[in-house]
Each structure stands twice: as structure tokens, then as C-alpha cells.
């Protein structure tokens, strides 16, 4: 019997909606990354993108444990000399709440073209509204 290998053109991708309200950031991100990679499917193949599309709602209401709300710091570099910027978790949630979940999930995906393709299937929104109703997403309880 030959080993099964998924082909990119035969992969069936579903759309799911996930509510992030009250969920712990890291635990949510690991499950999202797992589903973006397709590891929950029997036909998972490491070199083929077999994952599903995920819509995350209420990103502004995601939870963190301990003192991370004030102590966790996000850094980014502007490209200029002395241009390293930092923001706490609280500031990131106030300014761009979607980015917090995106950063957490992106770090858990493979680095390279395949990882970037997987990351493009993640859609994160701060509120409860999204513009993917035409895809008829199913509710996913994580």
C-alpha cells in the first residue's frame, strides 16, 4: 500500500468562525495554528497547505493570565537608526487588537512561503461583525 500524499488541488478547505472572547491568548493561538496547518485532518501532509480558513471575532476581548496585560511587551523596528518601538499588551489591545492574535499565531506557523500562505487564511476582527457571510462559515468552539 502506498503512502497517501495530499495534492494542493484536491484539498477541501472549510470556513470556521471562532469567538475569542474570554479565551486565553496562547491556548487559542495554538489551536488556530494547528487548524491553519491542517493537522486536525487525516490527509495532513507537511509540504502541502491542507488547513482551513478561520475567522476570529472579538479579538479585543482575548484574555491573558498573570500580569501579562501590563508586563508583556511587543517590539517592532521601523528600519531607522534607533527606531525600535515597544508597546505593552494593553496598548496593543487599545490600538490594534487584531494584531495581538496575528502575532501569536504567526510565530507558531512555519517560516517561509508555505507558512505565509497558511497565515493568509486567518481573518481576525476586533468586533462581532465580519464580511465573510458568503462563505457560510461554521461556528467552531475552541
Swiss-Prot record:
Keywords tagged on the record: Ribonucleoprotein, Ribosomal protein
Cross-referenced Pfam families: Ribosomal_L13
CDD domains: Ribosomal_L13
GO biological process terms, semicolon-separated: negative regulation of translation; translation
InterPro entries: Ribosomal_uL13 (IPR005822), Ribosomal_uL13_bac-type (IPR005823), Ribosomal_uL13_CS (IPR023563), Ribosomal_uL13_sf (IPR036899)
A GO CC term assigned to this protein in UniProt: cytosolic large ribosomal subunit
SUPFAM superfamilies, A to Z: Ribosomal protein L13
Keyword Amino-acid biosynthesis: no
MF annotations from Gene Ontology: mRNA binding; structural constituent of ribosome
Function: This protein is one of the early assembly proteins of the 50S ribosomal subunit, although it is not seen to bind rRNA by itself. It is important during the early stages of 50S assembly.
Assembly notes: Part of the 50S ribosomal subunit.
Family in the record: Belongs to the universal ribosomal protein uL13 family.
Matches recorded under PANTHER family: LARGE RIBOSOMAL SUBUNIT PROTEIN UL13M (PTHR11545:SF2), RIBOSOMAL PROTEIN L13 (PTHR11545)
Protein name as it appears in the record: Large ribosomal subunit protein uL13
Species name: Sodalis glossinidius (strain morsitans)
Protein's gene: rplM
